[in-house]
Amino acid sequence: MSSLTGKVKGRARKIKGDADIRVNESTENVGLVIRVMTAVVDIKFPSGKVPKILNALESKEIYNGKKLVLEVSQHISDSIVRCIALDSTDGLSRNDEFIDTGAPISVPVGRATLGRVFDVLGNPIDNCGPLTKSDYSIKPIYSEVPKLTDQKVTTEILVTGIKVIDLLAPYLKGGKVGLFGGAGVGKTVLIMELIHNIAKAHKGVSVFAGVGERTREGNDLYHEMIESGVINLEEKDKSQAVLVYGQMNEPPGARLRVALSALTMAEYFRDVENQDVLFFVDNIFRFTQSGSEISALLGRIPSAVGYQPTLAAEMGAMQERITSTNRGSITSVQAIYVPADDLTDPAPATSFAHLDSTTVLSRQIAELGIYPAVDPLDSASQALSIDIVGEKHYEVSKEVQRILQTYKSLQDIIAILGMEELSEEDKLIVARARKIQRFLSQPFHVAEVFTGTPGVFVSLEDTVSSFKDIVEGKYDHLPEAAFYMVSNINEAVKKAELLQKEGK
């Protein structure tokens, strides 16, 4: 694969290989491998010539069909550096030579990246050839957080078309959203539906970072984007998305840095092209997990639950770059795996502080067959205030939550004594709560191939007015089943008539 191009000072020659790196021929700094410990490699350089922290080192030899790139993480002595491998170290041996590139890992940015799939080093991995156009440049994956004076706060709602989110935990344009959930409760399906609903209607650019997740899901997403027209294979520059993958089969170094590579591409569209960018990450937990693996190999003493002592700093360094400025915005949607469904685990807990909206997926709701399995009581948003959503939306959402909370508190009594022991008022609340619970379900476009039910995009006006009618008791006469997997209240009425005809 042809190498990408980039500018450096001095007379430079290009090293052949996948990584986009240049070295100054007259001052080439070569080190030798002295120790290999899976994803961590120690390199010895001439005394006093150790590379700077975060510099990229490139192998002279070819391993597994490409050159191996390392990133300097620690200075062990005045001649030895400890590095993180960004690809497999299979075949590496002592005394192999590595060249100091004199710069951090850099990736291509610009319109030439649209419609393409990249790895952590910015190499195209979609079998569509190298980047050949001139409308891209090279940028290091590390950059400063925008100045406070340049940052901008918006109070505009981003409509997702998903009822439970738009009503109870709305997303802000230019905000950060977390999708929390354990294994198998629907985080990736929800993020794919959000990409389908928002990216398709969104006129700006979407950047997706696949951090340590399944390769199959990455492949599915790529083809989903092609089918929906977000990626145009014939005319790449008409595409609206960039995909950057560091999947779970890759070493921890790649999984740790791939989010920064994708974020660098997103920042270009925000800062240079003044666009509103959607930045999707699946999964932030894998970012933390890879940092924990690297930390242990680097010999750091772990902190709580075995995580790296630098967890908060690493998370903050990335999250603070995801912000809106006077030039453009980055709206971020991040899937966050919750180990053992424990939200107090340090990995998801560290993410909470950075988010504007949290969408929590519940296994108990998934067990009821209600999808998306969003917990309406655990999910929250800073946008749910009268000033932002308006009085009608705010009052309806609070009444929905009150009914669901009352139902939750009555469940123990119902389990022990049964419904008969409840007052008439409580029986009415339970009946409405069960209807609301089912009405929060919704068929997804991306799940249509599995369910056979066409997906729906529900407008915010439909969502608010439908729930207003339910909490006011206008549809108390309809059966619970009529509210399941429908878009709005009119569909629920039609479904009730159909059920009545069928004798259900």
From Swiss-Prot:
Q: Which residues form the signal peptide?
A: none
Name the source's superkingdom: Bacteria
Reaction catalysed by this chain?
Answer: ATP + H2O + 4 H(+)(in) = ADP + phosphate + 5 H(+)(out)
Q: What Gene Ontology molecular-function terms does this entry list?
A: ATP binding; ATP hydrolysis activity; proton-transporting ATP synthase activity, rotational mechanism
Record Pfam families: ATP-synt_ab, ATP-synt_ab_N, ATP-synt_VA_C
Alphabetized UniProt keyword annotations: ATP synthesis, ATP-binding, Cell inner membrane, Cell membrane, CF(1), Hydrogen ion transport, Ion transport, Membrane, Nucleotide-binding, Translocase, Transport
**Looking at the keywords, is Cell inner membrane present?**
yes
State which Enzyme Commission number(s) the record gives. Answer: 7.1.2.2
Where is the protein situated, by its record's location annotation?
A: Cell inner membrane
One CC-aspect GO term: plasma membrane
Membrane topology term: Peripheral membrane protein
User: What are the binding positions for ATP in this chain?
Assistant: G181, G182, A183, G184, V185, G186, K187, T188
Q: What is its main location?
A: membrane
Identify the NCBIfam families for this entry: atpD
Job of this protein: Produces ATP from ADP in the presence of a proton gradient across the membrane. The catalytic sites are hosted primarily by the beta subunits.
Give the record's family classification: Belongs to the ATPase alpha/beta chains family.
Subunit architecture: F-type ATPases have 2 components, CF(1) - the catalytic core - and CF(0) - the membrane proton channel. CF(1) has five subunits: alpha(3), beta(3), gamma(1), delta(1), epsilon(1). CF(0) has three main subunits: a(1), b(2) and c(9-12). The alpha and beta chains form an alternating ring which encloses part of the gamma chain. CF(1) is attached to CF(0) by a central stalk formed by the gamma and epsilon chains, while a peripheral stalk is formed by the delta and b chains.
- Identify this protein by name: ATP synthase subunit beta
Source species, please? Answer: Ehrlichia ruminantium (strain Gardel)
Taxonomic lineage of this organism?
A: Bacteria, Pseudomonadati, Pseudomonadota, Alphaproteobacteria, Rickettsiales
